[in-house]
Amino acid sequence: MADIPARTEMKVTTGPIRGSRKIHVEGPQGVRVAMREIALEPSSGEPPVRVYDCSGPYTDPNAHIDIMAGLPALRRDWILGRGDVEDYEGRAIKPEDNGLKGPDRSGGVTPFPNVVRRPLRAKAGQNVSQMHYARRGIITPEMEYVAIRENVGRAALKEKLLRDGEDFGAAIPDFVTPEFVRDEVARGRAIIPSNINHPESEPMAIGRNFLVKINANIGNSAVASDVAAEVDKMVWSIRWGADTVMDLSTGRNIHDTREWILRNSPVPIGTVPIYQALEKVGGIAEDLTWEIFRDTLIEQAEQGVDYFTIHAGVRLPFIPMTAKRVTGIVSRGGSIMAKWCLAHHRESFLYERFDEICEIMKAYDVAFSLGDGLRPGSIADANDEAQFSELKTLGELTQIAWQHDVQVMIEGPGHVPMHKIKANMDKQLEACGEAPFYTLGPLTTDIAPGYDHITSAIGAAMIGWFGTAMLCYVTPKEHLGLPDRDDVKVGVVTYKLAAHAADLAKGHPAAKLRDDALSRARFEFRWRDQFNLSLDPDTAEQYHDQTLPAEGAKTAHFCSMCGPKFCSMKITQEVRDFAATRNAPADQFIAAGDAEAGMRAMSDVFREKGGEIYLPAAE
């Protein structure tokens, strides 16, 4: 493992996504926002299609990527320019931070080589959270950045905004202004995860009235530990559309793995701090203390973690409610805290010390992701007393965090059949004051190990439509093993699909733009445009070429599904062409009210074509 930097540099994927180029849109205050532009064939006569881009500099051919140096500190000048932070020595890194407790110190990895900066924190009496700024009426560069990002595609539509959907009471604007972003953050309906010690991150918003976001989970375990693979999975996941990444490492080298990821991540990074705290006490939940947990929070905040999953809603009186469940407590963090509560027969230190946790969060602008430690792990346990009791507590904790101007989102289930999904969204909105909801799926059935990315994407699309702000991906390995690089891509693309489907259903103003562009390309047999406009151009072209690999097939007016004689779109075009020869618009011809005349006209077409049922493909 000592050769980790070289291996990491070799494995990270860079370069543009097929058919795309990186562009930057500049705002009035000089904020430059990265986007992806998909060029279409000149024959289409259509302008390029711009899409939201999470991939950072890794897809920019003009960027110099050096994993050992990390990414440029995009936000550092913004952070320092506000004048409310100070640098300080920070806590010393200890062997137990990397799970190297005891005499055996073997198995470590090379630390990130460029950790020379001193961490930042709020000056005494200051609060550096985006919510605090928003509530003071300040529009930060982060808010302006978010507004420009969220408007991608809307300028192209101009006054033809496509508002066709049901948003269930959301307040999605036609055009996102920095003022709108500020107001949503101030109300707690959106968060901008942006730790002041993660200046490499590109600002993004998680909220019901913005585009639905997705999260990808990575991280090593006690069974499989490879820092190079985790850094590569982070870069790979954002290439395909992950808006945030959670490092759920539980084995050795947790601190160093996280440092490599953070310094090279252009998206917010989340963690579950109790995992590392548990490693520090040798995996014995009963030995956890507030002091160890607090030290872990500060350690991770100094590194730059943008949001913490904290299972403060697992209360002692709720634990007996899970006794009759089919699958009990399935959350790792939830089970750890449940065991601690039972061993000490008292409320957890996460719950009792919540105000003190808020003080740490606002000193670094770390957002809460209040964990659903009692989420259902099977559809049999969905929407039960334990789940909703915890949800009510999370709503109470949200109000406490908001008193500190700390950003909050709420984690949700889990395993929920389709007919019970909307109740989860409705109860969360009511209990948690419209704080952003962040759900794992939910999985809509329990019978598909190996296909749980599909069972969960069904639920994810639904709950995203109902109002969930961010969807946590599920890979094909869910319940079976640690996902590899290929699993990560499948999970991300599947969830990008679910999130986009939700945006369409909500009536997001620009969501249909890409769909319509691809549909026109499909009808006009512009194969390369079809590939490039898709969520996964590589796989789309690969599937096409499995049966029609010749270069000429990229211009053919048919595919291998129907062949040249049965292509419905080709036949439709022939009908339109025939209508044009009759000096009538195609829609008028096809929609003619006189059925008899229409049938006679089609009879004429048949005879003019030689009376053959099947026709050869046009040259």
Curated annotation (Swiss-Prot):
InterPro entries: ThiC (IPR037509), ThiC-associated_dom (IPR025747), ThiC/Bza_core_dom (IPR038521), ThiC/BzaA/B (IPR002817). Pathway: Cofactor biosynthesis; thiamine diphosphate biosynthesis. It catalyses: 5-amino-1-(5-phospho-beta-D-ribosyl)imidazole + S-adenosyl-L-methionine = 4-amino-2-methyl-5-(phosphooxymethyl)pyrimidine + CO + 5'-deoxyadenosine + formate + L-methionine + 3 H(+). It comes from the Bacteria. Its cofactor is [4Fe-4S] cluster. Keywords: 4Fe-4S, Iron, Iron-sulfur, Lyase, Metal-binding, S-adenosyl-L-methionine, Thiamine biosynthesis, Zinc. Residues 93-104 have a biased composition (Basic and acidic residues). Zn(2+) binds at residues 415, 479. It is an enzyme of class 4 (lyase). Its EC number is 4.1.99.17. [4Fe-4S] cluster binds at residues 559, 562, 567. GO terms for biological process: thiamine biosynthetic process; thiamine diphosphate biosynthetic process. Substrate binds at residues 217, 246, 275, 311, 331-333, 372-375, 411, 438. The keyword Repeat does not apply. Binds 1 [4Fe-4S] cluster per subunit. The cluster is coordinated with 3 cysteines and an exchangeable S-adenosyl-L-methionine. One of its GO terms (molecular function) is carbon-carbon lyase activity. One of its GO terms (cellular component) is cytosol. Residues 93-114 are annotated as: Disordered. Catalyzes the synthesis of the hydroxymethylpyrimidine phosphate (HMP-P) moiety of thiamine from aminoimidazole ribotide (AIR) in a radical S-adenosyl-L-methionine (SAM)-dependent reaction. Homodimer. Belongs to the ThiC family. This is Phosphomethylpyrimidine synthase. It comes from Rhizorhabdus wittichii (strain DSM 6014 / CCUG 31198 / JCM 15750 / NBRC 105917 / EY 4224 / RW1) (Sphingomonas wittichii).
